[in-house]
A protein has these predicted regions:
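Short beta-strand elements at the ligand-binding edges of bilobed clamshell
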Residues: 27-33, 90-101, 145-159
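Phosphate/pyrophosphate-binding active-site segments
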Residues: 5-7, 19-21, 44, 49, ...
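Phosphate/diphosphate-binding loops
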Residues: 98-143
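Short acidic, glycine/serine/threonine-rich loops at helix termini
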Residues: 15-20, 63-69, 89-93, 122-126, ...
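Short beta-strand segments
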Residues: 7-9, 55-57, 113-115, 137
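Anionic-ligand anchoring segments at beta-strand to alpha-helix junctions in alpha/beta enzyme folds, i.e.
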Residues: 34, 41-108
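Glycine-rich beta-alpha junction loops
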Residues: 8-14, 58-60, 85, 140
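Aromatic-enriched
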Residues: 10-34, 175-178
Length: 182
């Protein structure tokens, strides 16, 4: 699940083949299997948090509904990096810009990183000792690449986010002081 560039010479574009050699047929590796224990652990940590933040990247583009539900149930601001813009409506009270997110970053206690490398936040904004990071990504090489998260979940978001929402259902907590800060 990384970006891939394939270069095909122009003289090959219109070449006809009768049969594709079997040794050229790719065999995709099977995807990660959702670890429900990690999801439960993440739900518990998020429910106990006082100042959660959600960070989204391009990997979360098709999961706007789930991200918005998580944001509302946690009263958590959402910071969108690069390809994560548009996942949450920019006019939402819980949508924050990068400069505002930078200010909130130092105060948050739990970060839920969804489909993002979380590179800018971790490398430029820093990590405080009290901050716990939950990182959900399909690419296991991205999880812990910069900093070891409290919980690293290697999973398809189509499996992880509904499961996380189910585990958090009925435990929504409005964080009035945190929302006012946003």
């Amino acid at each position: 699940p990384r970006p891939v560039g394939v270069e095909i010479p122009v003289n090959i574009w219109n070449t006809k083949v009768d049969k594709i050699p079997q040794d050229l047929v790719g065999h995709p590796k099977s995807g990660p299997i959702l670890n429900t224990d990690q999801i439960e652990e993440a739900a518990t940590l998020l429910n106990k948090s006082h100042k959660p933040i959600i960070i989204v990247g391009g990997g979360a583009q098709n999961f706007s509904v789930e991200v918005n539900q998580l944001s509302k149930s946690l009263s958590a601001p959402v910071i969108a990096f690069r390809n994560g813009h548009g996942i949450i409506d920019g006019s939402s009270q819980l949508s924050v810009t990068l400069p505002a997110g930078r200010e909130l970053w130092g105060e948050c206690d739990v970060v839920l990183a969804i489909g993002t490398r979380c590179q800018t936040a971790q490398m430029q904004w820093g990590i405080d000792d009290h901050m716990k990071i939950i990182h959900i990504d399909i690419d296991d090489e991205e999880i812990g690449r910069i900093n070891t998260p409290e919980i690293g979940i290697n999973a398809y978001l189509k499996d992880a986010l509904p499961s996380l929402l189910d585990n958090m259902s009925g435990k929504e907590k409005y964080r009035n002081d945190w929302v006012k800060k946003v």
